[in-house]
């Protein structure tokens, strides 16, 4: 690999990198504190669209992670930015929670089930047959189909949960329409994050625990990529992919001396 510029800004995934099964990853609180005191720009990225940045800040704080709201970038925020760029002041029928609805309201979108420009699907713990049926009919009537992220499952203390990608597949099967996924591994998620902190890809590193989203997304956006072994992907699994991260480390604790 060619020599890269020293890392001046950091993007890091949340689940599996900073927290795991409701607990902080060892070294993660120190890692966040080191990034904050260094003055280097950083963002915590998540494909989870359920929570607002304020909600996530509070949840992370309870685990000893001091992450300010402005340092969180979610697929919900990226979706809001994408829609505002595509069709300013548009309308959307939304299946999702406060993180997504707040992000769309913040960019001036009107949420409606009457002839919306878009059907926007995000994460929720209360998917209803009625809401999914309405989404199918609106898409059949011409609404464009957007989904915050392609993850088919998500983590919980009890085990895997169906995620937005699974519900999107069901809606696609019923309509014959594939959604446009905004979140990771779409490199647009990375580019929007970089723009948010005025960072450049050549001097930014992406830390993640998943080869199929975090590392792929970082590679396609031109970032240095760092795989940690505290989440989904193992060293053995990483070897099976046709692409490789810039490096593999045990956890973010191994990066403390670099910040």
How should these model regions be labeled?
Residues 2-40, 49-73, 77-259:
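Asp-based, Mg2+/Mn2+-dependent phosphohydrolase catalytic module
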């Amino acid at each position: 690999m060619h020599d890269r510029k020293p890392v001046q800004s950091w993007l890091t995934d949340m689940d599996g990198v900073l927290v795991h099964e409701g607990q902080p990853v060892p070294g993660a609180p120190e890692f966040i504190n080191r990034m904050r005191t260094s003055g280097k720009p950083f963002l915590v990225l998540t494909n989870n669209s359920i929570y607002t940045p304020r909600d996530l800040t509070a949840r992370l704080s309870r685990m000893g992670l001091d992450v300010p709201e402005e340092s969180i970038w979610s697929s919900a925020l990226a979706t809001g930015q994408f829609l505002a760029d595509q069709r300013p002041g548009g309308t959307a029928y939304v299946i999702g929670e406060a993180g997504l609805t707040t992000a769309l309201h913040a960019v001036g979108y009107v949420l409606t089930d009457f002839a919306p420009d878009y059907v926007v699907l995000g994460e929720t713990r209360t998917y209803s047959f009625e809401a999914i049926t309405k989404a199918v009919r609106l898409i059949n009537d011409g609404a464009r189909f957007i989904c915050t992220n392609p993850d088919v499952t998500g983590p919980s203390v009890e085990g895997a949960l169906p995620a937005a990608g699974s519900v999107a597949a069901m809606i696609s099967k019923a309509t014959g329409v594939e959604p446009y996924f905004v979140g990771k591994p779409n490199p647009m998620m990375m580019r929007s994050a970089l723009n948010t902190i005025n960072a450049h890809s050549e001097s930014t590193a992406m830390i993640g625990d998943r080869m199929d989203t975090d590392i792929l997304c970082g590679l396609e956006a031109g970032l240095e990529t760092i795989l940690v072994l505290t989440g989904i992907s193992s060293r053995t699994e990483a070897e099976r992919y046709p692409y490789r991260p810039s490096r593999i480390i045990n956890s973010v604790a191994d990066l403390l001396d670099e910040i």
